[in-house]
Every structure is written in C-alpha cells, then in structure tokens.
C-alpha cells in the first residue's frame, strides 16, 4: 500500500481541529495542533487523541498526564497553523489568550492509558471538566485545507 495515496484517501474525511495544551511551568506551555481528537465515551467521559511517534514534538507530549483540549472555531486558522510548527508559548501570550477566547470548547483531561499503534501513540483520557465557549462555526480540515 502506497503511504502517500493512503494519506490522500484519509484526507477525504473532514475533521475538526483541536489543540492539546500542557503546562511546562507557571509561565509557559507546550501545545500541538491535532485532528485526531475523538469522543470515546459519554459516561464516564473519555476522549482520545494520537501523536505521531516520529514527530519533532513527540518528546514534549509522550509523558503528559494533565492537558487541555481546545476545539477550534473558524476564526482560529492562524492559531492552528502556529501550533502546527511551534510547540512552546508563554502562558500569557496573545496566541494563548486568543486560543482561550475564541475556541468553541475547552476540555481539561487526565491521561488514563497510552497505547502504541503503528507509527502513533494513542492517548485515552478522562475529561475532568469542560467549558462550552461559543456557538460559532468550527474549523474544519478537509483534503489538506481548512474549510
């Protein structure tokens, strides 16, 4: 199976965009843009996401225990792009403030289990609390572009 063609096939599935954020210290965070976010269970509230084992950011996230998931709105393309190539930001920076202000929702989570499947590390996490921010259009990724 040709990996490039397989990736093209999978790109035909429209997904939302989320950002995983975990604290480094009281001043800064690590963050990464993902489209692998999924709800697993409503009761108890479990979610999942996955991380490419060959990603340059793998070491920043492989052992996280607590993290937040921000579900992005259509207004947040620049933030999505920023955290696709940058992983660190100051906690009080404009990019983090805009992430918090304009996201559709925030879920605060704790990692329950991690599994390695193929070339990805799969995280299963319990949602500890959540906040619904707004009712605007989501940021959608389809066929390699935002919609």
What are these regions (language model features)?
Residues 1-147:
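Basic, polyanion-binding surface patches
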């Amino acid at each position: 199976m040709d990996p490039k063609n397989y990736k093209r096939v999978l790109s035909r599935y429209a997904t939302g965009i989320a950002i995983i954020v975990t604290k480094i210290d009281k001043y800064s965070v690590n963050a990464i843009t993902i489209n692998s976010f999924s709800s697993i269970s409503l009761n108890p509230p479990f979610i999942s996401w996955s991380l490419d084992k060959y990603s340059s950011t793998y070491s920043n996230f492989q052992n996280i225990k607590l993290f937040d998931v921000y579900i992005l709105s259509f207004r947040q393309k620049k933030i999505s792009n920023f955290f696709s190539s940058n992983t660190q930001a100051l906690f009080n920076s404009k990019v983090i403030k805009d992430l918090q202000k304009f996201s559709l929702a925030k879920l605060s989570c704790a990692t329950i289990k991690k599994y390695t499947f193929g070339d990805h590390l799969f995280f299963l996490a319990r949602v500890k609390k959540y906040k619904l921010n707004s009712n605007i259009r989501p940021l959608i990724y389809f066929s390699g572009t935002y919609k």
